[in-house]
Amino acid sequence: MKVNTIWRGKRNFISECPSGFEVKMDATENYGGDGQGLTPMELILVGVAGCIGIDVTMLLGKNLENITKIDIQTEGSRREEMPTCFTEIKTTFIVEGEIDAQRFWKAIRLGHKKYCAVSASLKPEITYNLILNGKGIRENAS
């Protein structure tokens, strides 16, 4: 895979992707940018959420029929000193509908361990949470 990233002045870049889409990136004002695009660190969290979301929905297959909502909240904690890389990433699935919670957990676990290329490419441990119909559900340790 290859992307072409073009400088547009100051801290602004546009990446042209093989899928045909473009992504606009910029730094925040405190890093000399204008805040006119996603920051690269935001893109990492977007990538983690998108990758695990796609994998989980693929793994659930027909079990998605009775799910009405899947929101994925991804939060990264960063080091104070340079480089201010992520030290931890927490991902919470907020799900509504009829599905066995452990079946959903199995899809999260399998997606993370076997399929999600984004999370496999990152150093920090990524942890997951599941909120099903407003209730936090722990994964069974089986």
What are these regions (language model features)?
Residues 48-51:
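Alpha-helical metal-binding/catalytic segments enriched in His/Glu/Asp
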Residues 1-46, 57-142:
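Extended beta-strand/beta-hairpin segments
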